[in-house]
Amino acid sequence: EEQARLKESPKSYVSSTGVSFRLLEPNYILMGAKRSEEGQRANEVIREVDLTKPFYLGTYEITNSNFMKFKAKNSKGEELISNEEPATNITWNDAALYCNWLSSKEGLQKFYQQIGNKIVGLNLTSNGYRLPTEAEWAWTARSSDKKGVKQIKFPWGNNKTVKQGSGNFADETSKGSVDQFIPNYKDGYSR
C-alpha cells in the first residue's frame, strides 16, 4: 500500500503560499564522526540510521516574505532586509508554529500539538507539515540522488575547506551584518 501511494505522489509541488517542495526517498545514513576525525565533538558517536519513509522537503529556505505571511512582525535583522532572502532570527518554536500554520492553510492535520503559541507535543500520525528530523536533514546534506554514491562529509564534498561557489555562506562581505563569517573567503553572493 505504501509503495502504491509513493508512486502516486507527485515528485514535487508548490504550496498555496508559494513554497516549493521536493519528494525525497532516503535510505541509509551514517551519522556522527569518528573520534579521530577533525572537527568531531565530544558528544558525537557514529550511528547507523535507516530512513525508511520518503518525505517532502522545501526546495529552498523559507523567505522573509513567506514567513511574514504567517508572522508579520518577524525581525529580519538590521542588514538582512530583502524579502527574498532566507528568514532569520526564528526560534524552533516559531518554525514549528509556521509548519502548523501552513498545515492549516492546506487543510492538513497539524503535526505539532500546541497550547496558545507554545509547542507541547507531536501528532505522529499527522499528514501536516513538520521540520525535518536530524537524520533527514543530515541525509539531505550529505547524500547524492545517485544510488551507490558514497556519503560526503559536507554539502560541498569531503574537504573541510569550503569550495568557492559552493553556496551562499557568510563570507567577508557579510562582516558587520552577521556574528560570524568565513575569513578569506568569497562565495560570489556579495550584497
Q: Language-model segments: which ranges?
A:
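Extended, compositionally biased low-complexity polar/Lys-Gly-rich tracts
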Residues: E1, K73, K153-F154
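Pro/Ala/Gly-rich low-complexity, hydrophilic intrinsically disordered segments
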Residues: E1-P10
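A short glycine-rich, aromatic-capped structural motif
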Residues: K11-E78, N83-S103, T140
